[in-house]
């Protein structure tokens, strides 16, 4: 996986997390409806247990996504160049377009690309160091 692909995951994590939260909300609503509709206690308990298992599975997926997002944020925060770090945060954490970043930072898009390439090299160094140090 390239650095751009790795960091690019952060842009979609919020969308995935929103989907998971909506799934849990819908699941809880269905569980409440099922509890009201089901008459026998055994059937109700089995159904509610299944809903609980499904909710736990979705929570596990959310935790995995949050862990990945925290890892990406931590990796970006380790970049020692403020300008590089700011561009990575704006692009991959805030989802800004290159032209927006260039305008915000009073530079050309070409400069944004150049600094981003420099930042990618720093990320590779950080990831390599993390692997060598056994942090990953």
Model-flagged regions — what are they?
Residues 5-8, 67, 82, 96, ...:
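Short, well-structured alpha-helical interface segments that form or flank functional binding sites
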Residues 1-78, 125-136:
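N-terminal interaction/assembly modules
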Residues 79-94:
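Short amphipathic alpha helix immediately N-terminal
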Residues 100-103:
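Short alpha-helical "recognition helix" segments of helix-turn-helix
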Residues 112-126:
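DNA major-groove recognition helices of helix-turn-helix
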